Amino acid sequence: CALPIFILVALAAVFLFLLFQAWPLIGGDQAANTATIESFTGNRAHNFWQYVGPLVFGTVLVSALSLIIAFFISIGIALFISHYAPKKLATALSYVVDLLAAIPSVIYGLWGGLILVPAIQPVWNWFAKYLRWTYIFDGSLNDPSVADSPSRTVATVAVVLAVMILPIITSVSRDIFMQTPRLQEEAAIGLGATKWEMIKLAVLPFGKSGIVSASMLGLGRALGETMAVLMILSPGLTYSIKLLRASQNQTIAANIAAQYPEADPNIGVPVMIGTGLVLFVITFLVNFVARKITEKASA
């Protein structure tokens, strides 16, 4: 009984600390706040919300893209481990998935920056050449922002984050699929269903709430990811959805990590704490909505 109370107290303490520290910037003297933001951003933003808006957009964009990339691959791997692979292979793959989940994010950042960035450039060049009519893949091959920072774009970061959250979604989904009642599976097979039809009729409906929970866990990891984004993405403060252009977007967590060490205690630190409060609220809302969706799916 004491542990849940401790968790609630800790959560409330973090929220109140962020709110107390950020409130003068959010709800205080707006003229003074404007001067603070203009000084901190070099006149690129004139109020707190104008500054944090592109960061929220970049955070949501990168996280959503990574979830889209990872979701179907994770579910496929989880189904293969739970229902298709021989026992020894399934055990080995489970160990690999669990190991991937334990790798520190800075290692993923090094891999992304040193290996993936140059390796994936030809792929993005192909997208830019043949799919630029879609607007989101509009990235001129002669664009200086691409030439100076090859592949240090939202698209590349989304791929790296997808690899990071893939083992989380896979692991949780695998465990849920393996809990499917044997009687339901045998009943579907007994009615003449193929293995894939049995999965569609029994396994996926049984595991839909678990799939939602796994996806939200992965999304939460992506929302708060710092080092991998910081080490790969060429940052910018815009509302751009051009995934192949550098210096367009930035995430809240990576921006805090980049700015905080050199931030002025009277100017920069309150701004960083304010953006941290926004990230806290976003993460809380995502988990709250996920909880409601899971409850609805379980009903």
Predicted regions and their residues:
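Short, small-residue-biased leader/transition segments that mark boundaries at the very start
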Residues: 1-3
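Periplasmic/extracellular loop-to-transmembrane helix junction in inner-membrane transport proteins
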Residues: 20-66, 86, 147, 258-269
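Membrane-interfacial helix termini and adjacent extracytoplasmic/periplasmic loops
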Residues: 28-50, 108-163, 243-246
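Transmembrane-helix boundary motif in ABC transporter permease subunits
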Residues: 66-97, 110, 291-295
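Membrane-cytosol interface at the C-terminal ends of specific transmembrane alpha-helices
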Residues: 80, 138-141, 146-190, 194-197, ...
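Transmembrane alpha-helices
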Residues: 96-99, 103, 107, 169-176, ...
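C-terminal transmembrane helix and the adjacent membrane-cytosol boundary/short C-terminal tail
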Residues: 174-178, 182, 258-299
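Glycine-rich helix-loop "coupling/hinge" segments at transmembrane-helix boundaries
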Residues: 221-265
